[in-house]
Amino acid sequence: NKNTFHAILDKNLESYDVYPMGVSGSPMSQYLAVAKYASERFNPKLFVFLIIDNDFDESFMKRFPGFHYFDKFNGLKLVNYEPSIVKRLARRSAFLRYLYIDLKWIKQLQRIFGSEVTTVDNKSNKNKEFLEIGRMANKKFLRGIEELSLTSHVIILLDGDRKAIYSGLDKRDKNKPVNTLYDELGMSAKNIPNVNVIDLHNVFKREYLLNNERFDFSYDEHWNELGHSIASQALTDKIR
């Protein structure tokens, strides 16, 4: 897709060849596995990692077989891929693939029809567990980044809290534990040599104050063309 941030980046940076190697649904643990492969095969000058909300806890949750996940005691562990009935059906239908991969329709149905009752204590415990898992993921991810930075430059791109921006908040919403993980990851990564951090929250906020245009689609939270364009420009400015 020529409108994705990596395609625009490839066009903007004539002296670089940009290769997107990410897979939809993969967490930061999988990012490191792919980066290790790329480092050994292609010896790139620069790695760019885009971190989004579900990267933290899903690095341990083993939600999607076929990916690498962090092991609590060791490094990365590959979970063998065994396609479910839904995925086998999705292979036969482009529409089902769209529902399953892009809109995560199973999760949406679970939210609508789920029987779980959320209490204050339950939410507090879930937030605490989320932070604990996320901090472990950050620690292991940064350890991998330190290794990569010995031979290559690294840019870590942090997605912005777009809902907070649309609501008029100046900073990330501190009531969302994922924003604590973003902040902690960014602060720690800045201390690693050859590593730069771009916090897209500030980039998106400046753009929204100027033009009052959303960076995502009305039906899901994926970036739209404007979101990709803004992210690619921030990367271009940093690399140049």
Residues of each region from the PLM?
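Short, amphipathic alpha-helical "lid/cap" segments that border enzyme active or binding sites
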Residues: M28, L32, R135, K139-L142, ...
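Loop/turn elements at helix/coil->beta-strand transitions in domains of secreted/extracellular proteins
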Residues: E14-D17, N43-F47, L150-I155, I192-V195
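Second-shell loop/turn segments in exported
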Residues: P20-M21, L131-E132, F217-E221
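Membrane-embedded segments
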Residues: N1-F56, H228
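Catalytic His-Asp segment of secreted/periplasmic serine-dependent ester chemistry enzymes
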Residues: K163-R240
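Structured segments of extracytoplasmic/periplasmic soluble domains
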Residues: K11-N12, A38-R41, L50, L148, ...
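Short, glycine/charged-enriched secondary-structure capping and boundary segments
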Residues: K2-F5, A33-K36, M61-P65, L169-R172, ...
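Serine-dependent acyl-ester chemistry module
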Residues: D53-M187, L200-R206
